[in-house]
């Protein structure tokens, strides 16, 4: 099966993509995984190191074709503050818990978490449940995909309860198309893959 061995970051490619893969936040963190695009193109993501893929990135196949990464909508909490100072205070509390957080102009977005929802409401925030792509801040030590224009990526986990507190998230998500199946692609970082509802449950974490 053809492999995707490199990544081009957002705005670093102009050619038409041969296909696209629809991936949630967890699924955009994988090093090696069998995938099928929305138009049926099957390939194996086979990168050298872990890197966070973002919507708009392109996976480069061995024959030069590109596969666009599309960030899937998923269940989120949008946290709204009364003023900028309040927003900074809320962001501090989320950061203190090492929660992946997407910073918007006037709000914050996190994965749905009832405990955190209760906490920020207690701090005076307004919380709204939404469905949207999740693109959190990478953190001081994150390795962005554009830094990996060659081949550096890893990790991507589908569905089920993924905990990441300090890296702890709680995700319950499913997509049927542009999906990633693990198809038991094994390497030294991968234990075993479970193909389940068009999602990968693999264990090659960062």
From Swiss-Prot:
Record SMART domains: UreE_N (SM00988)
Gene3D superfamilies hit by this protein: Urease metallochaperone UreE, N-terminal domain, UreE, C-terminal domain
Region (Disordered): 136-206
Residue spans of biased composition, Basic residues class: 192-206
Entry keyword set: Chaperone, Cytoplasm, Nickel, Nickel insertion
Pfam families: UreE_C, UreE_N
Localization of this protein: Cytoplasm
Gene Ontology BP term (one): protein folding
GO CC entries: cytoplasm
Skewed-composition ranges (Basic and acidic residues): 148-169, 177-191
Any GO MF annotation of the entry: unfolded protein binding
Main location class: cytoplasm
Chain's role: Involved in urease metallocenter assembly. Binds nickel. Probably functions as a nickel donor during metallocenter assembly.
Similarity comment: Belongs to the UreE family.
HAMAP family, A to Z: UreE (MF_00822)
UniProt protein name: Urease accessory protein UreE
Gene it is expressed from: ureE
